[in-house]
Regions:
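An exposed, glycine/acidic-rich loop-and-rim segment of catalytic or binding clefts
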Residues: 32-385
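Bacterial N-terminal signal peptides
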Residues: 11-27
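N-terminal secretory signal peptides that target proteins for export/translocation
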Residues: 1-9
Length: 385
């Protein structure tokens, strides 16, 4: 592969107790190493009579590989401050590992048709109650049930040098959801080192829709250590707490809690806080933040001081699920044979609020015939100097 010329934006300044400077300095970096790509042969096969594969796209600055099994992102190479490329997402090197390794079935996948939790594995709408698959502790529905969007083979639609489009039909009655849900998803790499995700969906019956993506980020590369010393910022005045299997209906103000990241500070500050919500979630984040504002806006950012990479998350959705990888044990291995350690990754899942079908005060999750569901998400990568 030819050397990759990376046009990067770097922050002119960043205050660890304040806000990033509002202007950028453009820097042209010649990356000194080529990405070590996953071999597509490990993904060639079929599941349920549908062919599987691995596709590679690049914009000259970044390289992304994705499989149509669950629409998963397998690798994402971006430039770091020393002029080299680094793969910043966790993944596996073969299809078999994704299909048969079930400890973390959502690794890099599209999740839905209703991401996150539906408490009680049921919801009522227009006087009718819908019973769903109870795949979460036997009492709730998580990420669409036993066979969600992560566990099916998507149809390949089209590819350009820098974009890839998949299609999926979630059929009427699957996992208990009514109506046929027709979904298009496009991954795009833009010229400013951004990975864009766009979802479009239509239905022939009223049903809840909340599609998201589940990439695990380690900005130093898979197996490079924990994210505790990363600097986190979240654009949220409140978050949703949990109470056992339930999602607390009234948002909790972040003021005075371990969840207040309106000013950037270390991830480990929350992990070591002893906050009851953190303790209840095995010592880490697994919570929905109620993002301030509407429309396309910045929801959160994560900075790795060791290599200068800043990841900024933008979305038009009302919520952002933060998960700090506390359920990894170190016994698992990723695509490079390195251990997947506790707190060794971070997910930002742009979404509607969890359990919205059961909570009328939450943003409306229901899609009706004749309407189009849209969801836009951007992961923007920059180098800070």
């Amino acid at each position: 592969m030819k050397r990759i010329k990376c046009l990067l934006h770097s922050f002119a300044a960043f205050l660890f107790t304040g806000i990033a400077a509002s202007f950028f300095v453009q820097t042209l970096v010649s990356c000194s190493n080529d990405p070590v790509l996953v071999n597509p042969e490990g993904f060639a096969g079929s599941i349920g009579g549908k062919e599987t594969g691995l596709w590679t796209i690049s914009n000259g600055d970044m390289v992304l590989q994705a499989t149509n099994y669950g629409g998963r992102v397998v690798s994402l190479w971006v430039p770091e401050g020393n002029g080299e490329m680094v793969d910043v997402v966790l993944g596996h090197g073969t299809l078999d590992e994704y299909v048969n390794y079930r400890r973390e079935r959502f690794l890099g996948a599209v999740v839905g048709p209703v991401a996150n939790r539906i408490v009680g594995a049921s919801y009522s709408h227009d006087g009718r109650t819908y019973r769903l698959s109870a795949n979460h502790n036997g009492t709730g529905t998580l990420h669409g049930g036993f066979r969600g969007l992560d566990s099916v083979v998507w149809d390949f639609v089209s590819q350009t040098d820098s974009s890839l489009t998949f299609h999926c039909l979630h059929p009427d009655g699957a996992e208990g959801f009514p109506g046929n849900l027709d979904i298009l998803m496009t991954y795009t790499l833009t010229s400013d080192c951004t990975w864009k995700i766009d979802y479009l969906a239509t239905t022939d019956a009223v049903r809840p829709v909340n599609i998201s993506n589940h990439p695990y980020f380690n900005l130093g590369g898979e197996g490079s250590g924990t994210c505790g010393d990363y600097v986190l910022w979240v654009n949220a005045d409140s978050f949703l707490g949990t109470d056992g299997p339930d999602v607390i209906e009234t948002p909790i103000l972040v003021e005075g809690t371990a969840f207040d990241y309106r000013t950037p500070h270390l991830v480990r500050d929350a992990l070591e806080s002893g906050d009851p919500q953190i303790v209840r979630s095995n010592g880490g984040f697994d919570h929905n933040f109620c993002i301030n504002g509407e429309g396309m806006r910045e929801a959160a950012s994560l900075y790795n001081p060791s290599n200068g990479i800043l990841l900024s998350v933008w979305t038009d959705q009302p919520g952002l699920q933060l998960y700090s990888g506390q359920w990894w044990t170190g016994e698992e291995r990723g695509k490079n044979g390195k251990s997947l350690d506790r707190f060794g990754s971070f997910t930002f899942e742009t979404q509607n609020w969890p359990d919205a079908p059961n909570k009328p005060s939450f943003p409306n999750p229901f899609l009706e015939p004749g309407e189009t569901y849209t969801h836009h998400c951007e992961y923007r990568f920059r180098i800070m100097e």
